[in-house]
Structures are given as C-alpha cells and as structure tokens.
C-alpha cells in the first residue's frame, strides 16, 4: 500500500502507473503472439502469470475503493484514463487465456488421437482370427455315404450300364428300385420252373447292372417315394410316355415274331433262347437241368412274360429297359435287313449269269443279225476315220495360215520401224513445217499402238 500525503501526489502517481501500464501493453501483445507461435511454454507458468495479474488488479481496485473520497476533486480525465487502462488489461488477459486454452486443447487432442490409433492397430493385429476351412473333410463327409448319393448311386454301382439311356435325373433311382422289386418277384415266382435259372434268367433282356444289391433291404410293398433319395420327381411328359408305350409295343411285336424273324439265331422251341440270343446282348441263360428238354421253352416263356410294361406303367415311370431293348431290337433288325439285301443281290447276280438264253449260232437269223451288226460297226468306223481325217486337214490349214500371218506381221513391224527412223531423222529438218508433220505422225502412231 502506498501512503500518499496529498491528493495531488496520488493523482501524479496514478498517472505514472497508467503510463507504465500503457507502455507495458505492447510486450503483452507480443507475448500473446509468441505464445501462438511457440508451443514450448508450459500451462503451469501461464496459470501463475494469470494469478499474479489478477492479484494486481484486485490490489488496484482496493486502492481505488479506499481513495475514492479523496479523488472526488480530481479531473474526469484521470478517471477515463484509468478505465481505458483497465479495459486494455482485461482484453489482453482474455486473449492470453483463450490462446493458452486452445494450445493446450490441441496438444491434448493430438496426443489422444495418437494413443488411440496405436492401441487400435495393436488390438487389431492381436485380435484378428485366421479363417480356415477343411475342404477335404467337408467333401468326404458330403459324399461318403452311398445311400445319400441319390441319383448318383445308379451311376456309381452300374459301370456303363444305363448311362446311354438315362431319362431326366429324378427318375433313375425310383425306376431302379421298381425294377429290382420286379426282379425279386420274378425270382420267387419262376425259381422252380427254370431249374435254378431265376438269378441268371430273370430280366434276361435287361442290362445286368440293374441287379445291383445296394437296396435289397427294401420291402416289396414299400412305395416308390420311400427311396433314400429326397429328390422331387417331375411329372412325366405325355408325349414321352406315349413314345415309351410305342417302343414297348414294338418290342412285344418283335418278340412275338421270334419263329419267323429270329429263327436262324435260336436253337430252342421258339427261336428266342440258346447260345447266341440276340435279345439279351449275347448272354446265355444257363440252367442246372441240362438234360431236361423243356428248359428252352420255360426260358422262352419266362422271357416273353417279362416283356410286358404294365408294372412300370402302373407306377407312371419310364420303362428304361423297354427303351434299351427296343433300341437293341432295331439294331438287330437293321443288321438282318442289310444281310438279307446283300444275299438277295448276290442271288440276283448269280441268277443273271445262269439265266442267259441258249442261242444257236448256226441259224440264219443269227447270221443276219451278226452281218447287220458288222455292217453298222464298219460304217461307224469309216465315219470316225473320215472325221479324224477332216480334223487333221483343218489343223494343217490353220497352222499354215498362222505361219503366213506371223510372217506378214514381221514384215509390217519392220516397215514400221523403218518409217519411224525416217521420221525421226526428218524431225531435225530445217523446214519447220516438215518437222511439225513428222512429230504429229509419230504421236498418232504411238497413240494407235
């Protein structure tokens, strides 16, 4: 606290303090600018400076409050100068506080962002999981069980059997099951008749891979839909069903005509059984009772009884075996037809050789015919000689004309060359009229050539 003896001295002191404060203002502003540019100043020092300045302001305010009664006689100019100095100080302090707060906030934000980025990258590297799949294990589990193969089970169990005549995909397994059930029924029904030929003689016209034992545990009365595969079956096209029925009827017709069409291929009662049966792919149908004479007839009856397509038509399924059998029958029929045509052609040729009429060469009619033929041949030969002679003479005359024309052309070319030489010499003549005529003549000759 300053002890002033008189109001005049107090006023002088206040003026000096105000002047000192005004002189100190530029360094304060420079300090604010330096704080903006320089970031090395710590926040603790800034807070201490702010506290000191606030204490100075409080002291000045207390002095002003204590000495207000004494300053009533001073001029209004001193009051205005003090107010201006206080406002300038407050404004400078406010700016310093804002700059310090902004700098500290920016530094803190940058530090926090760097820390978060580093920790996040570390956590990502540590917590990432590698995704691996055991593809071989999945494939093995998916295709290990043959019962779950569905439609592929037929292709796996039958090497090249039904691959050529497979219908749309949903029908193969069901058709195979129905054919297997029919095979079992035929084995039970015809096992005693054929003398042990149930397994080998049943479905003799069918491809043998149909007898696969992958589904023998199924009941005969089980429905078609109880198959292990869960594939939905599409309805059969009526046109396709009609085509199958026609093929089955053609097969039955071919089988019924065994005594006439396939008589040469069989040695049994009806020509359909034996060592070289063309309808079952060359497979034999052995029987245990070799001395029994009724074996061929029993196998033939069994064969013809199995040709009906009523079983599969009842289940609304395509008759795969019927289509294959009809195809084989058509092939055999075409081969037989070709062989028959070849034999007929050979027989016709032999018949023509042996069927010539016997002509008596001593008769007058034969002599007259031979004379007429000889005269005609002689005349035709004379005419041919005359034509050849005329052609030769014409060729000779043309060759002579050609030689004459060639000679004439050579003479004319020589004359032309001579005239050109003459005109070339006359072009340099002293008379301009002569030279002009020669040039024009040469030009016309060149254009004409």
Swiss-Prot record:
Superkingdom per UniProt: Eukaryota
Annotated region (Disordered), positions in chain: 211-233, 276-302, 334-386
Region (Basic motif): 367-396
Keywords: Activator, DNA-binding, Nucleus, Transcription, Transcription regulation, Ubl conjugation
Pfam families registered for this protein in UniProt: bZIP_2
Principal subcellular localisation of the protein: nucleus
Record domain bZIP: where: 363-426
InterPro entries in UniProt: bZIP, bZIP_sf, C/EBP
The record's account of how the chain is modified after translation: Ubiquitination/deubiquitination regulates border cell migration. Ubiquitination is stimulated by trbl, which leads to proteasomal degradation and inhibits border cell migration. Deubiquitination by Usp47, leads to its stabilization and promotes border cell migration.
Basic and acidic residues bias locations: 357-368
GO BP annotation list: border follicle cell migration; DNA-templated transcription; positive regulation of border follicle cell migration; positive regulation of transcription by RNA polymerase II; regulation of transcription by RNA polymerase II
Record localization: Nucleus
A single cellular component GO annotation: nucleus
Compositional bias annotation for Low complexity: 215-229, 280-301, 339-349
Residue numbers spanned by region Leucine-zipper: 398-405
PANTHER family (UniProt xref): CCAAT/ENHANCER BINDING PROTEIN (PTHR23334), CCAAT_ENHANCER-BINDING PROTEIN GAMMA (PTHR23334:SF69)
Assembly description: Binds DNA as a dimer and can form stable heterodimers. Interacts with trbl.
Similarity-based family: Belongs to the bZIP family. C/EBP subfamily.
Function field: Required for the expression of gene products mediating border cell migration. Among the DNA sequences that this protein binds with high affinity is a conserved site within the promoter of its gene.
UniProt name for this protein: CCAAT/enhancer-binding protein
